[in-house]
UniProtKB/Swiss-Prot annotation:
Unstable only at extreme acidic (pH 1.0) or alkaline conditions (pH 11.0). IgE-binding activity is relatively stable under acidic and alkaline conditions, however the activity is increased between pH 2.0-3.0. Belongs to the triosephosphate isomerase family. Residues 16-30, 166-180, 205-219 are annotated as: IgE-binding. PROSITE patterns: TIM_1, TIM_2. Pathway: Carbohydrate biosynthesis; gluconeogenesis; Carbohydrate degradation; glycolysis; D-glyceraldehyde 3-phosphate from glycerone phosphate: step 1/1. Substrate binds at residues 12, 14. SUPFAM superfamilies: Triosephosphate isomerase (TIM) (SSF51351). Triosephosphate isomerase is an extremely efficient metabolic enzyme that catalyzes the interconversion between dihydroxyacetone phosphate (DHAP) and D-glyceraldehyde-3-phosphate (G3P) in glycolysis and gluconeogenesis. It is also responsible for the non-negligible production of methylglyoxal a reactive cytotoxic side-product that modifies and can alter proteins, DNA and lipids. It catalyses: D-glyceraldehyde 3-phosphate = dihydroxyacetone phosphate; dihydroxyacetone phosphate = methylglyoxal + phosphate. CDD domains: TIM. Its EC number is 5.3.1.1, 4.2.3.3. This is Triosephosphate isomerase. Homodimer.
C-alpha cells in the first residue's frame, strides 16, 4: 500500500525567519520539486499571509499551533478559522516543543486537533518519545498513549498526517536509523489497524521527523511505512529541495 499514499514533506520553520529570509526560501522553493510529493511549510503565525501570498499555490502553508475554540478571551492564541482566513489550510499540532517547552498535555492536543478538523483545516498531529523513554523500552507505550488520546477527536482521517518525531533526534544531529524509524512506523500502522480500522491504517500517511537531512532522507524514504518527513532546520535551507525529492 505504501505506493498508494502520496509522499508528504512538511517544513517546520519554528520561530525563525523574517520577510527577507522568507523571500530567499520562496526563491529556492521554486524547485524543481517532485510532482509526486505533497509539500507544506509551517511558518510563524505573523507571516502566514505573507508566505501564502508569495509561495506557489502547489505548496501548502501551515500554522504551527492553534487553540481549541473559535474565538474568545485567549490572549496570544489563534483559531483555526483565523488560519483559514489567512488563506492557509494546514496546522501542526502537538509538536514536541509544544508538549515539552509549553507543557501541553495529550488531552489539550487532542481537543485542538478535533476543533481544527471541525473548522475544516488539515492537521499534522505530532507524537514521539524522549530519550529516556526509548532507553527504558517505553517507545510503544508512549506513542500508543499519544495516539489513543488523539483518536476520539479525529473526525476525518483523510485530512490527517501523523508525524512521528522521536524527541531525542530533534535538532540533536542524532537520527533514528531507517530500521528504527520503520519499526515504529509499522507498529503505529498496526495500532491504527487494531484500534481504528484497516482502511485508515492503509491510507493514513505517517511521516518521520528528527534531524532529516539530504544525506539520510533517501534511505529513510525507501522504507515501507515512512510516507515522508517533517523537517525542521533543514527546511530553511536550499537543501530542503533534495529532501522533497527524496524518492526521485
Amino acid at each position: 500500500m505504501a505506493n498508494q499514499r502520496k509522499f508528504f514533506v512538511g517544513g517546520n520553520w519554528k520561530m525563525n525567519g523574517d520577510r527577507a529570509g522568507i523571500d530567499s526560501i520562496i526563491s529556492f522553493m521554486k524547485g524543481p520539486l517532485s510532482a509526486d510529493t505533497e509539500v507544506v511549510v509551517g511558518c510563524p503565525q505573523c507571516y502566514l499571509m505573507y508566505t501564502r501570498e508569495h509561495l506557489p499555490s502547489n505548496i501548502g502553508v501551515a500554522a504551527q499551533n492553534c487553540y481549541k475554540v473559535a474565538k474568545g478571551a485567549f490572549t496570544g492564541e489563534i483559531s483555526p478559522s483565523m488560519i483559514k482566513d489567512c488563506g492557509c489550510e494546514w496546522v501542526i499540532l502537538g509538536h514536541s516543543e509544544r508538549r515539552n517547552v509549553f507543557n501541553e498535555p495529550d488531552t489539550l492536543i487532542s481537543e485542538k486537533v478535533g476543533h481544527a478538523l471541525e473548522a475544516g483545516l488539515k492537521v499534522i498531529p505530532c507524537i514521539g518519545e524522549k530519550l529516556e523513554e526509548r532507553e527504558s523500552n517505553r517507545t510503544e507505550e508512549v506513542v500508543f498513549a499519544q495516539m489513543k488520546a488523539l483518536v476520539p477527536n479525529i473526525s476525518d482521517w483523510s485530512r490527517v498526517v501523523i508525524a512521528y518525531e522521536p524527541v531525542w533526534a530533534i535538532g540533536t544531529g542524532k537520527t533514528a536509523t531507517p530500521e528504527q524509524a520503520q519499526e515504529v512506523h509499522a507498529k503505529l500502522r498496526q495500532w491504527l489497524r487494531d484500534n481504528v480500522n484497516a482502511e485508515v491504517a492503509d491510507s493514513t500517511r505517517i511521516i518521520y521527523g528528527g534531524s532529516v537531512t539530504p544525506g539520510n532522507c533517501k534511505e529513510l524514504a525507501k522504507t515501507g511505512d515512512i510516507d515522508g518527513f517533517l523537517v525542521g532546520g533543514a527546511s530553511l535551507k536550499p537543501d530542503f529541495v533534495q529532501i522533497i525529492n527524496a524518492r526521485d
